Amino acid sequence: VQRLYPFQLSGGMARRVLFSTAVITDASLIIADEPTPGMDVKSAVEALQLLRELADAGKGVLLITHDIDLAVEVADTVAVFYEGRTVDMAPAAAFHGDGAELVHPYTKALYHALPQNDFTVYTAAEVTQMTAAGGA
């Protein structure tokens, strides 16, 4: 790996190299943008456990993902973006239970789309209508 250019690495290998770099440096903030695609399941689980350990050790970890289940399982706090803006910020635990702490209609739609919450799927028009009514 040491003699290879980044474009010569597979997606999973490149992510493993980046995780290794994060561990051996003294960075106070680690930004992980979609860290698990391209990794096999075992490597992805290990990478997420590593991020959790780094956060527990006092490092700042910003996990950027489209996988709401992953965010809820790994993060302490989940920020939800809609149309390029942060519309909600809640403890990850708020996505379990009844979702009463969730404020924005888009966040509530995401909550209801989770399999453990009856997997209610809304059309784009319904989400747009809900956010317009709820004040985006």
Where are the regions that the model predicts?
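Conserved ABC ATPase signature
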Residues: 5-9
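Conserved signature/switch motifs of ABC ATPase nucleotide-binding domains
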Residues: 25, 57
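C-terminal boundary and immediately downstream tail of ABC-type ATPase nucleotide-binding domains
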Residues: 98-135
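A short, surface-exposed alpha-helical micro-motif characterized by mixed small hydrophobic
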Residues: 71-73
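H-loop/switch region of ABC-family ATPase nucleotide-binding domains
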Residues: 65-66
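Catalytic Walker B motif of ABC-type/P-loop ATPase nucleotide-binding domains
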Residues: 30-33
